């Protein structure tokens, strides 16, 4: 009886803690949405931002956030796939491999502001990229690469060893087994990790303040010269993202309706991050059922 009572008490305590955490998160989400949703309109989502006048929008910042996300994923996904495949399939157990994994763990725990300062010193100053999308994308790659590499490695390791043995038994090479057997089996976990990392990238601010810049120059949508700083597809122009815009509006306080702009921007940012998170789980579940014919 005593053991059963302790079990019930422990269960009640755990449920209470979980309930408190969920309540805090739900309250925070509702607070941001209730404050921001009334100020969101089509003109707000597509309009140009204003530095000193009321009525500005977030169109360029929203586009910059997505464009920077795409460039970051183009760089980080192949790198994380290569590193994850090596660690899961080819790396032998030993001090060198353990050291690499320790470095990955350390890098994944670095504060984003430290990564931003590193990006500023290396990409902005040393490589002379200046405040630009490519500097921000490289900094975010450094920031997210450890987590994405670990996700790929874990996803590949969760594939049962019999799958590998079956591929090798058919006479195909180890690399072909990885490409045609292991990766398709682990694809749902890999894609889920990439989408979750996308949400993290989309909402990042500290690392981009020092690398991508804090201004959003007007874009010429008829200019498709990748080297032009007014081109929407240029990676060498400054690009204030939505998260940086929220920080800037709240810190500078030069916009008369800064509170409204900040609340609306925060709601938009939160909505997209929620879409990334819930979408990752739905997409991962769909791919798992599709690939395993469950």
Describe each region flagged by the PLM.
Residues 72-104, 280-289:
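Transmembrane-helix boundary motif in ABC transporter permease subunits
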Residues 174-214:
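Transmembrane alpha-helices
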Residues 1-20, 281-294:
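Transmembrane alpha-helical segments of polytopic membrane transport and secretion proteins
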Residues 1-13, 32-74, 93, 248-259:
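Periplasmic/extracellular loop-to-transmembrane helix junction in inner-membrane transport proteins
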Residues 105-141:
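Generic hydrophobic transmembrane alpha-helix motif, especially the helices
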Residues 52, 208-269:
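Interhelical loop and adjacent transmembrane-helix boundary motif
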Residues 63, 67-75, 79, 83, ...:
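Hydrophobic alpha-helical transmembrane segments of multipass integral membrane proteins
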